[in-house]
């Protein structure tokens, strides 16, 4: 490995998990099954929505794109993670690391905005049902989804550009199972203050903005539901967004654990565990959540 700057680094060594050898095969099988189940579930949900004319509505247009995003970001990290269990030296080229980080960051960010958009969709469906067809027109929901992809691409491009323009002279060993931002920054011998600021500003804004949209949407939704006189009406309205609320709770609960836990000696290992749940388990759960809680999706 070169010692000068980032252009001299040709590859990184992904350290993966600090687990004993006898458990590696078990983890490999479990994570492989989760990944395959995730692919089957999300591809199946996309095909179901595409082929069933009853599901050609904004309420199912958004989960369709959520499934696509889940496929993309879990596929960006899981194959390389599985490789870490089968190879002693799990290497990734510099270019491969850049691409993995870019793809993962793009779709992980888009995921946040899609969940916020889906909360807004639930708000309009429950709080303004008579105006729903006018507000959530085909043009509007296509623009909203396109916007989530654009924001994800811009966010990821900025982070990728600033991260991989650094000088790496400490080591080429990334203490993670994929090319994630903070473990990569830990290898740099450059001043990373601007990178930390970008992380705080971009990631902080993305999380806070989307969380606030979701929180305020559900505040209005709950107020509207509580005002309903009919028990059946309340139940029907709540079931409309129950699947989304479940998905959001799991998604942001995991992110909160990842980014808000206090720093400690085992915090990096905890981050790896949370990253597994965020990057592999949640994409598997989403199609199950939507299919079980929506009668049309069964």
UniProtKB/Swiss-Prot annotation:
Disulfide bonds join 97-189. Residues 1-25, 76-99, 155-196, 259-271 are extracellular. The keyword Protease does not apply. PROSITE patterns: G_PROTEIN_RECEP_F1_2 (PS50262). The keyword Disulfide bond applies. Glycans are attached at residues 5, 155, 265. CDD domains: 7tmA_OR5AK3-like. The chain crosses the membrane at residues 26-46, 55-75, 100-120, 134-154, 197-217, 238-258, 272-292. It is found in: Cell membrane. Belongs to the G-protein coupled receptor 1 family. This is Olfactory receptor 5AK3.
């Amino acid at each position: 490995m070169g010692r000068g700057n980032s252009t001299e680094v040709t590859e990184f060594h992904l350290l993966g998990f600090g687990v004993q050898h006898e458990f590696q095969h078990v983890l490999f099988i479990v994570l492989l099954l989760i990944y395959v189940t995730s692919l089957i579930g999300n591809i199946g949900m996309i095909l179901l929505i595409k082929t069933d004319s009853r599901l050609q509505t904004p309420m199912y247009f958004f989960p369709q794109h959520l499934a696509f995003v889940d496929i993309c970001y879990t596929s960006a990290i899981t194959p390389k993670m599985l490789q870490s269990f089968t190879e002693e030296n799990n290497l990734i080229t510099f270019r491969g690391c850049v691409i993995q980080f870019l793809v993962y960051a793009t779709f992980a960010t888009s995921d946040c905005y899609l969940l916020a958009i889906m909360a807004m969709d639930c708000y309009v469906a429950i709080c303004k049902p008579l105006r729903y067809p006018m507000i959530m027109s085909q043009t509007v929901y296509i623009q909203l989804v396109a916007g989530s992809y654009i924001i994800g691409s811009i966010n990821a491009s900025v982070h990728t550009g600033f991260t991989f323009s650094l000088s790496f002279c400490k080591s080429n060993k990334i203490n993670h199972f994929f090319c994630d931002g903070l473990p990569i920054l830990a290898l740099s011998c450059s001043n990373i203050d601007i990178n930390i600021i970008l992380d705080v500003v971009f990631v902080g804004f993305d999380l806070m903005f989307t969380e606030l949209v979701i929180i305020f949407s559900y505040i209005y939704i709950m107020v509207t539901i509580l005002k309903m006189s009919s028990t059946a009406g309340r139940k029907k309205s709540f079931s409309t967004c129950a699947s989304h609320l479940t998905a959001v709770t799991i998604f942001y609960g995991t992110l909160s654990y990842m980014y808000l836990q206090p720093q400690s000696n085992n915090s990096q290992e905890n981050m790896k565990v949370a990253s597994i749940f965020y990057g592999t388990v949640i994409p598997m759960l989403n199609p199950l959540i939507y299919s079980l809680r929506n009668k049309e999706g069964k």
